[in-house]
Amino acid sequence: MALYEHVFLARQDVTSQQVESMIEAYKGVIESNGGKVEKTEMWGVKSLAYRIKKNRKAHFTLLNIDAPPAALAEMERQMRISEDILRFLTIRVDALEGEPSAMMQKRDRDERKDRERGRRRDDDGYVGERNEEG
């Protein structure tokens, strides 16, 4: 079977739970066609460089997939039909990475720096001073 990295962007107005249910549905498609999803990473809501289907932000998600091409084609077909998916990209790779992706490493690094500086970061990326009172 072939190895793939698949990233998809879901509309900003869907909830994180809905994104998780989409991930589970797409995992089911892959597994029912003889493949498996090795790793899933939700990168959160990020700003887009330009508007896509009238959206300025999107939920970014990465899937590392080990599946036959037919399974991937079926998953992509279902993503094309879904109105909640803005874009997706699938790349065939020689080997899947076991460690966190660069996006997750960046998030961890940013959170660590904010803790050291006494700041907090919310889901939208806003950085504000930590409130010590409560």
UniProtKB/Swiss-Prot annotation:
SUPFAM superfamilies per record: Ribosomal protein S6
Comp. bias regions, Basic and acidic residues: 105-134
Keywords, ordered alphabetically: Ribonucleoprotein, Ribosomal protein, RNA-binding, rRNA-binding
Domain of life: Bacteria
Record has tRNA processing as a keyword: no
KW Lipid metabolism (keyword) present: no
GO CC annotation: cytosolic small ribosomal subunit
Pfam family, one: Ribosomal_S6
InterPro entries in alphabetical order: Ribosomal_bS6 (IPR000529), Ribosomal_bS6_sf (IPR035980), Ribosomal_S6_plastid/chlpt (IPR020814), Transl_elong_EF1B/ribsomal_bS6 (IPR014717)
GO MF annotation, one: structural constituent of ribosome
Annotated GO biological process: translation
Region annotation Disordered: where it falls in the sequence: 99-134
NCBIfam families per record: S6
Family listed: Belongs to the bacterial ribosomal protein bS6 family.
Function: Binds together with bS18 to 16S ribosomal RNA.
Name under which the protein is recorded: Small ribosomal subunit protein bS6
Taxon lineage: Bacteria, Pseudomonadati, Pseudomonadota, Alphaproteobacteria, Hyphomicrobiales
